């Protein structure tokens, strides 16, 4: 099961602008798919029902890719999409972070219907990661945008009141970049505080999903560079992975121990990662 990583380019980082594939021992396989529709790739998610990889392209489109590395569906260019992260929701649709509109949209996996706003436009100053909790609530990390504007919190939206979120997390040491739900139902967030600062503190932080209190902090403890942490993903055997500037860093979620870099590549500028197929 290879590890796939989106490597940013352009304004998002001086990376390779490609979807890269690594062996589980960290060996670089190369580019998973070479297609000019993949530009400054961002969010990734696997649809287990069809075993397809969904990729958010900086070319304002979403692509569905087979395990053989072929594009099998393409939304075509959606004006102003500017997608960020992507996940599958409880209803089976593909949810996309909309950076310019500061909200979240959803698409059917068949791409046969228009993008639908799930939350109102500009619901946060700048959306970072988001995920659905085990109780159906939608958690959205609100962070700092490229222009330096924004806030640092996590909001919770209930299905019945998506317009009136609750401010779940108020942590002065948090500046979120991505968000995922842990096997125990808690929220884990990658953080760079202050965002963009040369002396920023990098961490992965776990919060209680019910009251938002800080449970624990994962840190590299000298076993990894861990600069510019971005996308989070849980892998096999309780492995928590976080992609960063030059590496993918692994943590044992149960113990909290940093396992070091499980893959390294100078200028990786990783944005998101998945294990696929």
Locations of the language-model features?
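A short beta-strand motif characteristic of beta-propeller blades
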Residues: 27-35, 70-77, 113-121, 163-170, ...
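Short loop/turn segments immediately following the C-termini of beta-strands
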Residues: 8-10, 57-58, 99-100, 143-145, ...
